[in-house]
Swiss-Prot record:
Its EC number is 2.7.1.24. It is an enzyme of class 2 (transferase). This is Dephospho-CoA kinase. One of its GO terms (molecular function) is dephospho-CoA kinase activity. The lineage of its organism: Bacteria, Bacillati, Actinomycetota, Actinomycetes, Streptosporangiales. Belongs to the CoaE family. Residues 3-200 form the DPCK domain. ATP binds at residues 11-16. It holds the Pfam family CoaE. Its main location: cytoplasm. It comes from Thermobifida fusca (strain YX). Pathway: Cofactor biosynthesis; coenzyme A biosynthesis; CoA from (R)-pantothenate: step 5/5. GO terms for cellular component: cytoplasm. One of its GO terms (biological process) is coenzyme A biosynthetic process. Catalyzes the phosphorylation of the 3'-hydroxyl group of dephosphocoenzyme A to form coenzyme A.
Length: 200
């Protein structure tokens, strides 16, 4: 098995890369999806979040209001650290369960936004960083998610910098071009991952 950590800032197109790698045959484990799963209604993590941040972070249906929580934590590093301390250990446990199900000879891609922030690079055989300039991140997120520019910039500033991400990368995918260019680059990266898997 080859364990690959895939990361990139908000709006970098990391999920597009993950989808393409899955199409090539990778088992993709999505940290964001797992993070949503571990805070479903009735979970211990959601109860802890409400105890920490109050009922204001719940929707009328009793689900986590991610937008409201985001407004609170992305403006305050201490609160963000507290949220991460609740959610990340549970995401880690669930991830280990999923990885344990992978067959021998599988390329497992762990799609994790906060790989650099949580010092996780050493857990992977290969780290892939999806890289775009900050202005591209801002343009994409304001256009695709309808988020105000100042909110997007606050999220970017709460994440690792481009330089910090690039410093831990074994492979960098520049995603500032076209969809076709991304297809071609991901195909090259898949070949490289196959080589690394078979040379182990």
């Amino acid at each position: 098995m080859l364990k690959v950590g895939l990361t990139g800032g908000i709006g970098s197109g990391k999920s597009s890369v993950a989808r393409r790698l899955a199409a090539h045959g990778a088992l993709v484990i999505d940290a964001d999806a797992i993070a949503r799963e571990v805070v479903e209604p009735g979970t211990p993590a959601l109860a802890e979040i409400v105890a920490e941040f109050g009922d204001q972070v719940l929707t009328p249906e009793g689900r986590l209001d991610r937008a409201r929580l985001g407004e609170i934590v992305f403006a305050d590093e201490t609160k963000l650290a507290r949220l991460n301390a609740i959610v990340h250990p549970r995401v880690g446990e669930r991830t280990q369960e999923l990885m344990a199900q992978a067959k021998e000879g599988t390329i497992v891609v762990y799609d994790v936004p906060l790989l650099v922030e949580n010092n996780l690079a050493d857990q992977y055989d290969v780290v892939i960083v999806v890289d775009v300039p900050v202005h591209t991140q801002v343009e994409r997120v304001t256009a695709n998610r309808g988020m105000p520019e100042e909110q997007v910039r606050a999220r970017i500033n709460a994440q690792a910098s481009r330089e910090q991400r690039r410093a831990v990368a074994d492979i960098i995918i520049d995603n500032s071009g076209t969809e076709e260019e991304l297809d071609a680059r991901v195909a090259e990266v898949w070949e490289e991952l196959q080589r690394r898997l078979h040379s182990r």
